[in-house]
């Protein structure tokens, strides 16, 4: 319903601790979003980025390893260009959504893909001088030590 979509875009969500490669739960103050008349939805194809509403009316954004079908109501879909931002948002950070047209989404995607394709040209190897590395001891430079003089029983 339109009223639920308007409420959704006006709500400030918090990235929950619950999240993995399957999806990210979002928390917010107040009552859950109404799924009136939508809880009898047959299972259908799910897209990465779909925003499902749980039985309690809480949003859950589906990520790269989400299920392929589902029957929960969905209020929208996060565009592919924004999914990396959402997936990497630390727990406790505020998130908000806005509805955009298909044309706007396609323009954002085109710009996103252009930036990704230009990365190869812009990226340079990082060469660091160990003398100037203040965090050198933080690196695991060896994974174990053995003695060349030890017998197989001692090592």
Locate each region found by the language model.
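Conserved "landmark" site that anchors the functional core of diverse proteins
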Residues: 1-155
């Amino acid at each position: 319903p339109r009223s639920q979509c308007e409420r959704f875009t006006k709500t400030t969500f918090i990235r929950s601790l619950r999240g993995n490669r399957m999806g990210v739960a979002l928390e917010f103050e107040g009552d859950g979003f109404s799924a009136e008349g939508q809880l009898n939805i047959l299972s259908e194809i799910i897209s990465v980025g779909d925003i499902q509403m749980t039985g309690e009316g809480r949003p859950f954004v589906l990520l790269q390893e989400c299920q392929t079908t589902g029957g929960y109501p969905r209020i929208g879909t996060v565009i592919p260009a924004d999914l990396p931002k959402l997936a990497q948002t630390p727990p406790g950070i505020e998130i908000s959504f806005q509805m955009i047209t298909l044309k706007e989404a396609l323009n954002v995607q085109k710009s996103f893909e252009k930036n990704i394709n230009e990365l190869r040209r812009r990226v340079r190897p990082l060469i660091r001088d160990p003398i100037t590395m203040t965090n050198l001891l933080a690196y695991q430079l060896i994974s174990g030590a053995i003695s060349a003089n030890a017998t197989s029983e001692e090592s």
